[in-house]
Swiss-Prot record:
GO terms for biological process: regulation of DNA-templated transcription; regulation of growth; single-species biofilm formation. One of its GO terms (cellular component) is toxin-antitoxin complex. GO terms for molecular function: double-stranded DNA binding; protein homodimerization activity; protein-containing complex binding; toxin sequestering activity. InterPro entries: Antitox_PemI-like (IPR039052), SpoVT-AbrB_dom (IPR007159), SpoVT-AbrB_sf (IPR037914). Antitoxin component of a type II toxin-antitoxin (TA) system. Labile antitoxin that binds to the MazF endoribonuclease toxin and neutralizes its endoribonuclease activity. Is considered to be an 'addiction' molecule as the cell dies in its absence. Toxicity results when the levels of MazE decrease in the cell, leading to mRNA degradation. This effect can be rescued by expression of MazE, but after 6 hours in rich medium the overexpression of MazF leads to programmed cell death. Cell growth and viability are not affected when MazF and MazE are coexpressed. It comes from Escherichia coli (strain K12). The gene is mazE. Keywords: DNA-binding, Repressor, Toxin-antitoxin system, Transcription, Transcription regulation. Residues 4-49 form the SpoVT-AbrB domain. This is Antitoxin MazE.
């Protein structure tokens, strides 16, 4: 559990969200959030406009039938690392 405090931002109260939580929620500055009061608890949830997939979910449907061939891009150039 992370503790924070209510501060002033202009004329409004504000709570800082630590970077670790922003990363865990895949949130960025200016992303829209939904704020609700449920049973005396302040609930802040990201508003997802597009689905967010994990790498495991994205590769789960890869089969030998739809797997693309490897492409030979040649040798690395300059500072490229392969």
């Amino acid at each position: 559990m992370i503790h924070s405090s209510v501060k002033r931002w202009g004329n409004s109260p504000a709570v800082r969200i630590p970077a670790t939580l922003m990363q865990a929620l895949n949130l960025n500055i200016d992303d829209e959030v939904k704020i609700d009061l449920v049973d005396g608890k302040l609930i802040i949830e990201p508003v997802r406009k597009e689905p967010v997939f994990t790498l495991a979910e994205l590769v789960n449907d890869i089969t030998p039938e739809n797997l693309h061939e490897n492409i030979d891009w040649g040798e690395p150039k300059d500072k490229e690392v392969w």
